[in-house]
Amino acid sequence: MTINLILLSLLAYVIGSIPSGLWIGKFFYKKDIREFGSGNLGATNSFRVLGIKAGSIVTVMDILKGTVATLLPFFFQLHVDHHFWLLTGAFAIIGHSFPLFAGFRGGKAVATSAGVILAYAPLLFVAALIIFLLTLKISKYVSLSSMIAALAALLISLFMGDWILIILIACITLFVVWRHRANITRIRNGEEPKIKWM
């Protein structure tokens, strides 16, 4: 059982390491998104550099990485406590943030983390998504909306009584805020780009 979990966690890391934005940019647009915009491999920079269509595809792919990785114990019929689903999900987040296939320079973990929550706690995902979209509609800042959605997910999870989930989301929230520290500075200075399509 332990060996199976280790193998699934490694597989989850590999799944998380798939650099969706980088590959779509290179294969279909002949662009390395690391050389444009914020230089980040995540969905937000994909929108900025490649456009709405490509950005949407990258977002869905990054979410699916987290969802598929979280459900690996289920897919492989590994009869373990459902909290172990969060373990494989966490490895996908690590893979997305430090991808094997992109020199360990990855995204900010927002979409892949959302995918983990979607697989484990769908209603929490829906609540966080609504908060994200409302904040985005008002502020036009993807970065700010991501951080607020992460904080909201943490607050909501406190009422769910699942301490493993709470701990993971707390770690995700801290990591997301830390990865957005440059964005926070730009927002304060009025230099953060706003979206124009919403």
Swiss-Prot record:
EC top class, as a word: transferase
Gene Ontology cellular component list: plasma membrane
A GO biological process held by the record: phospholipid biosynthetic process
Membrane topology summary: Multi-pass membrane protein
TM regions (residue ranges): 5-25, 56-76, 84-104, 114-134, 158-178
Catalytic reaction(s) noted: an acyl phosphate + sn-glycerol 3-phosphate = a 1-acyl-sn-glycero-3-phosphate + phosphate
UniProt-recorded Gene Ontology molecular function terms: acyl-phosphate glycerol-3-phosphate acyltransferase activity
Subcellular location: Cell membrane
Major subcellular site: membrane
Stored InterPro entries: G3P_acylTferase_PlsY (IPR003811)
Keyword set includes Cell cycle: no
Alphabetically ordered keywords of this record: Cell membrane, Lipid biosynthesis, Lipid metabolism, Membrane, Phospholipid biosynthesis, Phospholipid metabolism, Transferase, Transmembrane, Transmembrane helix
Matching NCBIfam families: glycerol-3-phosphate 1-O-acyltransferase PlsY
Family membership noted in the UniProt record: Belongs to the PlsY family.
Quaternary assembly: Probably interacts with PlsX.
PANTHER family: GLYCEROL-3-PHOSPHATE ACYLTRANSFERASE-RELATED, INNER MEMBRANE PROTEIN YGIH
Protein name: Glycerol-3-phosphate acyltransferase
Organism of derivation: Listeria welshimeri serovar 6b (strain ATCC 35897 / DSM 20650 / CCUG 15529 / CIP 8149 / NCTC 11857 / SLCC 5334 / V8)
Lineage: Bacteria, Bacillati, Bacillota, Bacilli, Bacillales
